[in-house]
Design a protein with these regions (language model features):
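A short, N-terminal "cap"/entry segment at the start of jelly-roll beta-barrel domains
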Residues: 9-125, 225-226, 233
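Short, conserved beta-strand element in jelly-roll/cupin
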Residues: 132-138, 145-161, 200-202
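Short acidic-glycine-tyrosine-enriched beta hairpin
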Residues: 125-127, 151-153, 165-184
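Double-stranded beta-helix
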Residues: 190-233
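Structural motif
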Residues: 158-159, 184, 193
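Conserved short histidine dyad/triad with adjacent acidic residue
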Residues: 113-119, 128-146, 167-168, 180-183
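An internal, amphipathic alpha-helical element
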Residues: 93, 107, 136-137, 147-155, ...
Length: 233
């Protein structure tokens, strides 16, 4: 195996280790670990494809540098080591219906890479995705849902989340978020970029759907002009 493949494998293992330490915290963690436990992640199944850099490299480096929580030290070190081995892609609304308006902030700076999944750089899987997701500072990831059940492991120090009609709530680094199939959710990013582990457990080819809320423009204006100090949590 190549050094690159070993670094990607180590990154996957660091995520699995964290999830195992938080088994039973959320139903989604147990389901995810069961799925991963049934996969063949042996050396001979590793993929070796060329890396792909990104125009958002400076934001990405800042996001990784901002992973400072002690419980995330292993993931942070492995991600830093493997960053230039990964295939980084932008979402240009290809996961949404044609014409979906995702907002200027999201369009300006979003990034993801798959470690396990379709077109992944670690291991191929036809109906499971595990990867890294990043958003630029002061971004609203508008309310949306999807058929794929989703687990987030937040790596950033703070990010705001809204689930359905609930109020916004801030979540710290190391927090786990479970979005059941079809459950609406939104994310707001403050002065520092947002970075997380994301996992889609099935239905990875399903589309995302915007769930309209009347306050999108107001939130985006506040994020762009004032930062997180204007929000009550």
């Amino acid at each position: 195996m190549t050094d690159k493949q070993n670094r990607i494998h180590a990154l996957i293992c660091s995520v699995v280790t964290y999830l195992k330490a938080h088994r039973s915290c959320l139903s989604g963690v147990d389901i995810t670990l069961d799925k991963l436990g049934g996969m063949n992640l042996s050396d001979e199944r590793r993929i070796d494809i060329p890396p792909q850099s990104t125009r958002h490299d400076e934001v990405l480096r800042n996001a990784i540098a901002g992973i400072v929580a002690p419980e995330l030290v292993e993931i942070a070190a492995c991600l830093k080591a493997a960053k230039d081995d990964l295939v980084w892609r932008e979402d240009n609304a290809q996961f949404y219906q044609q014409g979906a308006d995702l907002g200027k902030g999201y369009t300006k700076c979003n990034l993801h890479t798959l470690l396990i999944g379709l077109d992944a750089c670690g291991y191929h899987h036809p109906d499971f995705s595990l990867g890294i997701f990043m958003l630029g500072p002061r971004t609203l990831y508008r309310d949306h849902n999807h058929e794929a059940p989703e687990l987030y492991l937040n790596l950033s120090e703070k990010s705001g989340w809204r689930f359905g009609a609930s109020d916004w709530e801030d979540y710290p680094a190391g927090s786990l978020i479970w979005n059941a199939s079809g459950a609406p959710h939104a994310t707001r990013v403050y002065e520092q970029p947002f970075i997380s582990i994301f996992i889609w457990l099935e239905n990875v080819n399903s589309r995302c759907n915007l769930v309209h809320c009347d306050d999108w423009e107001e939130i985006e204006h506040e994020l762009a002009g004032l930062g997180s100090c204007c929000f009550q949590t």
